[in-house]
Each structure stands twice: as C-alpha cells, then as structure tokens.
Regions:
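Intrinsic disorder/low-complexity signal
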Residues: 1-2, 173
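Catalytic NTP-binding/metal-coordinating core of nucleotidyl cyclase/transferase enzymes
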Residues: 2-107
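Catalytic beta-strand-to-alpha-helix segment of the class III nucleotidyl cyclase homology domain
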Residues: 82-179
Length: 179
C-alpha cells in the first residue's frame, strides 16, 4: 500500500492509525430533521467520542497522552499513536481505545466499521493527513463491509516488532491475535 517516504521528510511520523466510520450516518442525519431527540443523541455521542481523549487518560502510562491523537469529523474518527514511544506497546493501547469506544457506541445502538494500519501520518490536534490515513480509509471502505474493525497485516507485524518491554515477542503475538 504505502510506498517508502523520503528519509528527509520530517512531516510524517510512523504511527498506528485507526479510521472509524459510523454506519448509516446519512440516514440518521436525515431522520434528525424530524426528531429533535435523535439530533441530541447524535450530538451527545459525537461529544462523548471527542472527549474520549480526556476521559480515557491513563496516568499509569504517562507517555500515552503525548503519543496519542484523536480527531472527530462528521461521522468519522481517527486515532493515532506514534509507533516508537518510551516503552513501545502502542498497538495494544490503540486497540484498548478502540475496544472502549466501540463498546460505548454499541451500548448506544450506534454501529461502525473501521480499519487499523501502520504507516506515515501527520496528526496534530485537528489536522490529520498522510498515506496511513488513506490506507486505513481504503481498508475500511473495501474490507470492513459490515460492523467490525479490521487490522491489517502491517499493523500486526509492527505491533509485534514494537512490542511492550514487558512482553516477549510470542506473548505480544498471542495477545494481538486474541484481540
């Protein structure tokens, strides 16, 4: 998917990236014209997701908030983690974020699909672009055709390579496969 980026390119960082899309959002929005309660529900859901960065902070992992970015726009969400943090294990933390968010959405009867990949990305506050985002979007569109989150092979390989310092390679592989 992603071609090699010139080594002198200092804009992109290597990141684990998830692109999530709320399914049927256009139809839901059309329904909000007639149903003010539904409009409030959608607003509350999007605010909840946008606040996930604040609400899901984990003080036991101090580097996490510097390594993670979350952006919400319309019916989509992007979460990224720099791949090489102080103790690695970024894919694990991304998967935990995704599982919490997806559980919250399912509880609210909101369905989604998404994709996780690894690659070059610029993601800072509200600005997000790069080959990894395009790849995640294309995987979401082409592979995740029903409610689920697909993890591509590149993300798994890099997740194992950049494993937590607390796990062996085999432990990390087993853990990632179980998720």
């Amino acid at each position: 998917m992603e071609e090699n980026i010139n080594k002198s390119n200092t804009v992109y960082r290597n990141c684990f990236v998830v692109f999530l899309d709320i399914m049927g959002f256009k139809n839901i929005i059309n329904e909000t014209k007639k149903d003010g309660d539904l409009a409030r529900k959608i607003k509350d859901i999007l605010i909840h997701i946008a606040n996930e960065k604040i609400n899901n902070d984990d003080e036991s992992v101090p580097w996490r908030n510097d390594a993670r970015n979350i952006s919400v726009f319309s019916d989509s969400m992007v979460i990224s983690y720099w791949s090489e943090t102080v103790i690695n294990g970024s894919l694990y933390h991304l998967l935990m974020d995704v599982s919490y968010i997806c559980s919250d959405l399912i509880e609210k009867d909101v369905f989604f699909r998404g994709a996780i990949t690894y690659g070059h990305l610029y993601h800072d506050k509200n600005i997000c672009f790069g080959p990894a985002l395009v790849d995640a979007y294309m995987i979401e569109e082409g592979v995740a055709v029903y409610p689920r989150v697909v993890i591509d092979d590149i993300a798994i390989e890099e997740g194992v390579r950049l494993k937590s310092v607390n796990n062996s390679t085999e432990e990390e592989k087993d853990f990632l496969k179980k998720l």
